[in-house]
């Protein structure tokens, strides 16, 4: 019998309307544009997602301001992040791709790549729908793994193949895991992360620079400001509450931090009335 529990690990749909919803938290979104286009903001930047483009989003909550054309058609496969980890080939290339997709989730595919990618999507769907197959979960895992390998190949073709040493990959993975867990809310010094990873701050910065092209400080501040931006949009906390939530030494320092990285004061975003609560 098929493993019925697998149905909560993969969701296949023709819409991106729920990509930023709580329902999809913990899922990776893989979307292939069949026709039309969509405009959206991600990670604080504006992107276009058009015909024959592939989009891979690790954190759907960072997607905002979606504007979808009337002729937009898309095939979407949401996969539980833990299941993706089980399916991902033992290759350090995944780290390079993960960092690149965090900065730009859209990959432009040529005709041959699009045809192959569409075949991969249909392959996953076929295995997902074949409930009576004895090796149901294993077959889906293989289909997803093949799709991921093609993603790696697309990325290497478009952006160049550069390998990362196993040691660098392990440390970078642990560093990003700490940021994913929200450590930046209480710790924004490189020395803290370096100490937790049992390396020097200089070595951690060197690893970040070589694997991602950005410093450790960049990633710490990037995660911090994206989280702050999300709370500012929701307007669920006051100015002082947000300063405390992110463990800033004072509201004044919090204000300067937001001004520096967002180009606006938090009081303007939250509103004067909110600040006086």
Language model features by range: what are they?
Residues 68-129:
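A hydrophobic/aromatic-rich effector-binding and dimerization subdomain
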Residues 39-41, 62-70:
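Short beta-strand His + acidic residue motifs that chelate non-heme Fe in jelly-roll/DSBH
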Residues 210-249, 271-277:
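Terminal helix-turn-helix DNA-binding modules in bacterial transcription factors
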Residues 49-62, 78-81:
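Conserved metal-binding segment of the jelly-roll/cupin
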Residues 132-138, 152-177, 181-197, 210-218, ...:
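Short, Lys/Arg-enriched, Trp-marked, Pro/Gly-tolerant hinge/linker segments that flank
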């Amino acid at each position: 019998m098929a493993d019925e529990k697998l149905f909560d690990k993969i969701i296949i749909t023709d819409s991106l309307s729920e990509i930023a919803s709580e329902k999809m938290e913990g899922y990776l979104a893989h979307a292939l544009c069949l026709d039309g286009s969509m405009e959206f903001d991600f990670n604080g930047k504006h992107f276009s997602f058009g015909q024959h483009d592939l989009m891979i989003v690790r954190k759907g909550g960072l997607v905002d301001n979606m504007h979808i054309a009337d002729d937009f058609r898309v095939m979407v496969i949401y996969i539980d992040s833990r299941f993706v980890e089980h399916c991902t080939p033992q290759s350090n290339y995944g780290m390079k791709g993960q960092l690149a997709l965090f900065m730009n989730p859209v990959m432009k595919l040529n005709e041959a790549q699009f045809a192959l990618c569409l075949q991969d999507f249909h392959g996953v769907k076929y295995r997902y729908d074949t409930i009576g197959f004895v090796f149901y979960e294993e077959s889906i895992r293989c289909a997803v793994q093949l799709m991921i390998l093609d993603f790696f190949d697309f990325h290497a073709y478009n952006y160049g193949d550069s390998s990362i040493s196993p040691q660098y990959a392990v440390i970078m993975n642990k560093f990003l895991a700490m940021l994913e867990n929200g450590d930046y809310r209480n710790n924004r010094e490189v020395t803290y992360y370096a100490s937790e990873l049992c390396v020097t701050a200089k070595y951690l910065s060197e690893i970040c620079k070589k694997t991602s092209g950005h410093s450790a400080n960049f990633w710490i501040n990037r995660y911090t400001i994206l989280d702050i931006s999300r709370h500012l949009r929701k307007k669920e906390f006051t100015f002082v509450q947000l300063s405390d939530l992110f463990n800033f030494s004072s509201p004044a320092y919090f204000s300067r931090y937001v001004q520096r990285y967002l180009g606006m004061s938090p009081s303007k975003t939250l509103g004067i009335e909110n600040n006086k609560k």
